Each structure stands twice: as structure tokens, then as C-alpha cells.
């Protein structure tokens, strides 16, 4: 059976369960070119000062919004142009999620990490298509999935010839409109061989909690992120925005960007202790 790489390198960014955590961060969706550059510049500046490896994330299409009327993003073609320019300007790798097999080939020339949404983590054809691009694949563990069941998910990618895969914990369904984070899932998934990422913002999401959109409890992002880092992870996934309360999607669980530096400093301290760095 093909195995995953325990250390995944993306440009100058390294994901390893025994190394300092890398950060995947950015707004939920790509709103405009100007907004993307503003957010990217802020994140690049703070992570450079703190010495944290950054992968910038944003979604060109939020295809699984609660309501048909909800905003979804600027679309694939425009987003690829922006991602290419962001990489030239700031030099970091970029990540976006894909929802169909056709999108894999379309984004791979520009995007460094293809992300499989949690709802789609068992879609075999999508996993194979993402794997065959040769890009790093980040798989969100489904809210309905046990951590040990990620073994089969990851093997669909590695057995398609791609050992560079990340496994991301983003909470598990706990009754209606609620998620809970079981920190046991982090070492369990690490035992499967891949670097493990903890999604601190979607883990506090309340799916469909606002009727026509999802709610969230951003006040618990730091609590869960500290717990995850204390257990030990290769990376943290944190969505952020300059004005979360007025963001077009996932505002209730995004971290205000001006609060990110203090949060990251605390998490770095926990990371050093947990890993003996």
C-alpha cells in the first residue's frame, strides 16, 4: 500500500507533526482583488515578523452555502488571476477548495494546495483527480467521519500516486447545528502517516444555525486552537477577516485580523512546549 509523506513541503513551507506549526489563513471567500491583496498583505507582514510559515487560503466558489441566495465568491477564472498575482507579490503558496473533478485541472497550474471540502471527502473521483494533478492535497475530515476512517480517504490519494497529503480536523457533528472537537482525533490521524492540520474556525461553526446561513462561536477559536497545539499538529487553519460581522460568509467564526498576531504568539508558545522546540 502506498504511504503518505510524514513531512510535506510546499515551496518554503513545511508541514510536519514534529516541526513548528505552519499556518493556513485567509478570508473564507475571495471577495474582490483589492480585498484579497489587503488581507494577504496583513497576513504576510504578521507571519514574517513572527517567523511563521504561511499558506494563503481563499475560496473562489462557496458551493455548499446554506441558502441559494448566499454569496459564493468571484468565480474560478477571476480567482486564478488574483492567486497568480498574489504569489508574485508575496511569494507564499496558495490554497483553494475544489468541488468537481474538472476544477482540479483548472486550478492546478496556479494553486499549490487543492483542498477537498469535508462534505466531499469520500468522493473517490474527486480525490483521484486532485491527486493526479501532483499538487499537495488537503483533505478536510467529514463532520460525519471517525478519525480512523480517514485511512481509506488518504489511501485513495496516495494509491493514485500522490504521497503529499494533509489531513485536517474541523469538528464532528454533535446534535443539530453543532460541532464538537475531539482532540483524540489529532494523534489518531497522525498515526495514519500524514501531517495533521487543525481547523480552528470551522470547528466553532454552527452549521445552518442562522436558518439561511451558518452561525459560529468565534470566542472559542483560541480555546480549541490552544488545545490542538498542545496535543501537537503540523498546521493550523484559521479564517480571518478585517470585519467578520459583515463578511459575506462564515463571519461568525472568523477571527478579526487585528487580533491574529496576539493569538498566534500564544499558540507559538504552546507549540514550543508541546514539541520541545
Curated annotation (Swiss-Prot):
Query: What are the GO cellular component annotations?
Result: cytoplasm
Pathway given for this chain reads:
Carbohydrate biosynthesis; 3-deoxy-D-manno-octulosonate biosynthesis; 3-deoxy-D-manno-octulosonate from D-ribulose 5-phosphate: step 2/3; Bacterial outer membrane biogenesis; lipopolysaccharide biosynthesis
Location in the cell reads: Cytoplasm
InterPro entries assigned? Aldolase_TIM, DAHP1/KDSA, KDO8P_synthase
User: What SUPFAM superfamilies does the database record attribute to this sequence?
Assistant: Aldolase (SSF51569)
Q: Which UniProt keywords apply?
A: Cytoplasm, Lipopolysaccharide biosynthesis, Transferase
Q: Record keywords: Manganese included?
A: no
Identify the EC number(s): 2.5.1.55
Q: What class of enzyme is it?
A: transferase
User: Chief localization class?
Assistant: cytoplasm
Reaction(s) catalysed by this chain, per the record, are: D-arabinose 5-phosphate + phosphoenolpyruvate + H2O = 3-deoxy-alpha-D-manno-2-octulosonate-8-phosphate + phosphate
GO BP annotation list:
keto-3-deoxy-D-manno-octulosonic acid biosynthetic process
Provide the GO MF annotations for this entry.
Answer: 3-deoxy-8-phosphooctulonate synthase activity
* Family from the record: Belongs to the KdsA family.
Query: Which PANTHER family has this protein been placed in?
Result: PHOSPHO-2-DEHYDRO-3-DEOXYHEPTONATE ALDOLASE (PTHR21057)
Q: What is this protein called?
A: 2-dehydro-3-deoxyphosphooctonate aldolase
